[in-house]
Amino acid sequence: MAKPTRKRRVKKNIESGIAHIHATFNNTIVMITDVHGNAIAWSSAGALGFKGSRKSTPFAAQMASEAAAKSAQEHGLKTVEVTVKGPGSGRESAIRALAAAGLEVTAIRDVTPVPHNGARPPKRRRV
């Protein structure tokens, strides 16, 4: 039987892009796209092996940001605009990690969706 051919990853030469940070209460997902929204690199706390409540920590968000930035820099990325969505604890540390990884952060935008009194929120937890 013939070996399945593996598709070679094409190295894209992209100078600037957008880093989308989705910080939920349970996880942090970092996706880096070009200006048109095509994905270049992504990472998340769960994909790096953090499980359970450790996924929601700022440290896990920092590691996810570093991994995504490293992968994006292989495609020639140098500057990013950051869009942050969600109320999670990894918002600040993810942005700092992108800058520390060598990407120049040009703008930070908060795009957290705010309902105009839409769906009823979940009931309060009693622990």
Curated annotation (Swiss-Prot):
Chain's role: Located on the platform of the 30S subunit, it bridges several disparate RNA helices of the 16S rRNA. Forms part of the Shine-Dalgarno cleft in the 70S ribosome.
Keyword entries, A-Z: Ribonucleoprotein, Ribosomal protein, RNA-binding, rRNA-binding
MF terms in GO: rRNA binding; structural constituent of ribosome
A cellular-component GO term for this protein: ribonucleoprotein complex
InterPro entries according to UniProt: Ribosomal_uS11, Ribosomal_uS11_bac-type, Ribosomal_uS11_CS, Ribosomal_uS11_sf
Cited Pfam families: Ribosomal_S11
Gene this protein is translated from: rpsK
This protein's record includes keyword rRNA-binding: yes
Family: Belongs to the universal ribosomal protein uS11 family.
Name the record gives this protein: Small ribosomal subunit protein uS11
Source organism: Streptococcus suis (strain 05ZYH33)
Summary of subunit composition and partner proteins: Part of the 30S ribosomal subunit. Interacts with proteins S7 and S18. Binds to IF-3.
Classification of source organism: Bacteria, Bacillati, Bacillota, Bacilli, Lactobacillales
PROSITE patterns xref list: RIBOSOMAL_S11 (PS00054)
GO terms classed as biological process: translation
